[in-house]
């Protein structure tokens, strides 16, 4: 079995265009996995292998690649930087042990890098930092380090200093070894020399080296005191051991300067992955849960000697067939083994499995704890987040949680052939992407696609058209409005029906009130005595909960309602579970209007970058879109504006922004929260929904 201490499962995270994919290309070149580096701007990068990725120059899927450096195995996942594809970041973080946060030397801490950093903190993933593109105009290593501290609240542990700035950036000073690494102008990563620190940087390097040592030794108080009192000078290995501890505890983040495009500084980052990021055995083991998702106090111990436990974290369908990407946490898996899908209860035999090199693969006969592999052609309806395990020792790993879609479009196939193709294609696409939802409008028969943003759905439609050959008519984007209540009330409802023989009877007395934001539906009972027998409580809860899907204002789902059953009545003969379920449904229809039904809309956290001379125009436009400006931050080449803006006001924003800023503005947005719609907006939305329903009804007659 392979030595798990020499495994590094890492992700590369950053904002769009900070250089994640280019960095991955350089890693693959240096580790011998590819012999010619492909460039993102040429559409030739190894990990951006989808047609849509190559065209748009962005990473959409998390591509997994394996390589070796200094006798250590790296499983590297290159993740998207665009906010519409954060599902890929979510699921990557679930299966990784460490990461490299890439920041643009001129752009600094940009919106999506901030979001990804927050996700990684939540997942407790240790990271090192790479300040990339130091050859760019306006690049400033020290300013980015300050932003990491001020904006992210993180402690960058500076490990290298850049030699030269912008187009004169030639290499770095390694503070630990007190040596300079200088590359020539050939652009080849192997063409560098290790030399003495340039004379004009000796004093600065000495100052930063002391800071590095003091910060590193803070994880070992005794050693720090001895160092500060002049009683000892720690060896490089002692310093590295402290850095390793502090990195894995996320006390600080080793920080390096580089230019991936110019092939400068990457080797030191690879060394840092080996030296400081955790192996699979260094991180906390994955918790196990019961079937309801509640932790049971047990864990998936990372060891090849344990029973097989793995998580399916990604499903793709490509020219090889269906690939199920799996992180093995415990045990071993051999070709021909039978495994259990804990979610479906089905077992199946593993026919083929492989190690992925972006869109190429190496066939495997076995894999072990710590490995990230792909199983080919699984048939047990495996979906993202499903647990795979030994049939004799069934377990459930902690589930993956994904954000809900906030935008929808309707699509209609143009002919019968496209209808059949679309049905097959959508089934595969839903399995691949948990934030992509599909449903059919009962009234119109239209297919409704829902996702995380305009680009997300644009890519999905493009895949349907070009990958699967589906001819489509696409409707306008629709906002995921919701309904809620604003007032607490007490009410009573009686369901009574008599039509010969036994009838139906159920009476419920209840309190209904607004719930906490994000609480969804909460039901409780404080009934004392036997006025409503306990056996009917589940039916009452089911009745209320079933009505949450369709609000009374415009038929949108209802959010954040608490209902407390406190009394009622029943009939010995006529009461039944069905009668009480119907009573709850009637009660919901009766009480929601009384409780101040209100339309609410999704609010997006919008981050806009604009050149200085267009700030006024951009802020004015955001205000016209009902935006609430949250702050401004001046940068080297422009201003970053933060605002909360209703999603309904953001359609087509990128075109407006480019026009206002002569093509130089950029923005990103992600869902933040729901807020009440202004009355004038609510009236328009409700009227449009009702008009559409009348039109559909008329079309059916």
From Swiss-Prot:
SMART domains: EFG_C (SM00838), EFG_IV (SM00889). GO terms for biological process: ribosome disassembly. Its main location: cytoplasm. It holds the Pfam family EFG_III. It comes from the Bacteria. The keyword Cytoplasm applies. It is found in: Cytoplasm. Keywords: Cytoplasm, Elongation factor, GTP-binding, Nucleotide-binding, Protein biosynthesis. Transmembrane segments: none annotated. One of its GO terms (cellular component) is cytoplasm. This is Elongation factor G 1. It comes from Colwellia psychrerythraea (strain 34H / ATCC BAA-681). The lineage of its organism: Bacteria, Pseudomonadati, Pseudomonadota, Gammaproteobacteria, Alteromonadales.
